[in-house]
From Swiss-Prot:
Involved in the biosynthesis of ent-kaurene diterpenoids natural products such as oridonin, miltiradiene, eriocalyxin B and nezukol, known to exhibit antitumor, anti-inflammatory and antibacterial activities, and in the production of gibberellins phytohormones. Catalyzes the conversion of ent-copalyl diphosphate (ent-CPP) to ent-kaurene. The keyword Flavoprotein does not apply. The gene is KS1-1. It is found in: Plastid, Chloroplast. This is Ent-kaurene synthase 1, chloroplastic. Belongs to the terpene synthase family. It comes from Stevia rebaudiana (Stevia). Residues 1-28 form a transit peptide. Accumulates in leaves. Its cofactor is Mg(2+). Binds 3 Mg(2+) ions per subunit. Pathway: Secondary metabolite biosynthesis; terpenoid biosynthesis; Plant hormone biosynthesis; gibberellin biosynthesis.
Amino acid sequence: MNLSLCIASPLLTKSSRPTALSAIHTASTSHGGQTNPTNLIIDTTKERIQKLFKNVEISVSSYDTAWVAMVPSPNSPKSPCFPECLNWLINNQLNDGSWGLVNHTHNHNHPLLKDSLSSTLACIVALKRWNVGEDQINKGLSFIESNLASATDKSQPSPIGFDIIFPGLLEYAKNLDINLLSKQTDFSLMLHKRELEQKRCHSNEIDGYLAYISEGLGNLYDWNMVKKYQMKNGSVFNSPSATAAAFINHQNPGCLNYLNSLLDKFGNAVPTVYPLDLYIRLSMVDTIERLGISHHFRVEIKNVLDETYRCWVERDEQIFMDVVTCALAFRLLRIHGYKVSPDQLAEITNELAFKDEYAALETYHASQILYQEDLSSGKQILKSADFLKGILSTDSNRLSKLIHKEVENALKFPINTGLERINTRRNIQLYNVDNTRILKTTYHSSNISNTYYLRLAVEDFYTCQSIYREELKGLERWVVQNKLDQLKFARQKTAYCYFSVAATLSSPELSDARISWAKNGILTTVVDDFFDIGGTIDELTNLIQCVEKWNVDVDKDCCSEHVRILFLALKDAICWIGDEAFKWQARDVTSHVIQTWLELMNSMLREAIWTRDAYVPTLNEYMENAYVSFALGPIVKPAIYFVGPKLSEEIVESSEYHNLFKLMSTQGRLLNDIHSFKREFKEGKLNAVALHLSNGESGKVEEEVVEEMMMMIKNKRKELMKLIFEENGSIVPRACKDAFWNMCHVLNFFYANDDGFTGNTILDTVKDIIYNPLVLVNENEEQR
């Protein structure tokens, strides 16, 4: 199938791009034809993102500033310790009488009414506490009275701890003689709900969570517990509101030192959490990687991860007192080859549980990269999946629209599976430039989400698409030039073969790797069909002999036109690889590529002879041959000569290199045999499922065998994942190991529903990667 013929007008020019792109940026104009507008946009945007790595910004919090404003002076308890915070509250009330995110584009819509209620009530209490701002108090009360029904509305999204914090503030307001026009029954109901929530936390032994929201408990909280959760900087979980409440109720000097340091840094208003630099920079790395633009920021990413690893080794509180940061740090460090254990993450999830959806979400992502030996200590980590499924099915109304979608996608598309470029496209299309986060109140950081990331990701995606289209055209010409399209017995899968590498080795500079991968993918498909149905045993043997001899007279040595076409195409591809790889490796690797092809064809010949002779091998005998005959060797092994690092003969012949290949190929063979069992059984072909049924325990049915084999695939995958991620003792460069890992993702994709190439459902996905424009679904939507 020629994909180009399936798509009308596939070549998208700059002018035919979707309007979404022009909405993101104003295109640069060239001067005298010397400046490429796209390159100028990319370079300028990269510079802006690089600056974001140096300066972390976070919005101030009306809610937390109000709690800091309530703190009395140690020397004069009837006076505020931080009068500048009171002045800030007076000067930053919103037009409708509420307090919330200041200078925020969506604030006027009150996407989180409960957040506005708790922030506004905290500000009213702070002002009343010191008898200032009477006009602001009255306007705030009017807002609360108009929206108080939302406090008990289960369909409204809730900040963390709202069911404890808001009733606590109501009680505090009542003690200050603040008269809210609310029904006594509603007030009693909220207090009762607070009591139930407190009991639930105690029964589940999540005292750390109660400490985090302790300002809502007042006299119900044992303030002596503060020391257990007090960090070295004097704060309670880096929360200004909890720390302020702790000082008000316990006069802990460390708490006051923390609050003073906050005001020294931020002036007259504070954020909802501080410090947050490490988490924000990790979020930047995560976002950049998800959007497919990490190749632009390799130095910045390494600097962030090196610093994070230093903090991990030193057991820095920024990591180990917060589930979200710990889970994110663990995942990014492990994926990038740093030696980290999940034990600390398991410990913190046991202590703090999942205080919000983001905590569960990040922990679930981390659970995807646990090794087999991690599973016993990571039971609490694995519970994150159940938590996410539970909130989707029973309590989805309290989730924001954005988080709800993130949870759905996390469960549907696990973070460590799937094809890189498919994930990138989906992440770009769903990206929200106004990703406001929710803790006890909402906050925003331009480091976490902004238009620069999206602008660069879109331009980069289209740049890559234009490269892919040209490479695919060249491959289609190569197929015709080598007469492979004339082999009627063979499947024509040029677009599929190219797609499999464009979706994984996506960077522009990896063009040689993509061409090598795709050419050999095309050839292995054709050769597989030749050994399967297109050739006689004599022809198969003749083809192998020609490759072994190499310098042959095709007119004399090839026994048929089919053999002639196949040999010349193989020689053309192998010689091209040898010539181009020399530029990367500074040595001739042609003999290794030839040997890889010979290993494949000999394994295929062995299977053909077994079939001819009606020989039934043992399962072990079959698998030792079948992982090679699955034909991934010629695709992956030559391609890794083009991904960057130099590969010595020692590396290529090492047991580590062989194990990488065997684990990858075994997974592929088992997936293929599971999905093609019924068809191959009818055709009388050898298959692992059939052999397992015939050689295994009596009475086993197909479903049981398939279940066992799927578990085997899962274990092989975890074993391979460990080989890929771990650097200690490894001699195969990471970029090369990633090629084996990427092929596993390709296999999972192709065998998700059908037995590899026999399904047509992937055609739309192929178009998405190579041809179709992006559709930015969040561009004109309100965030919540």
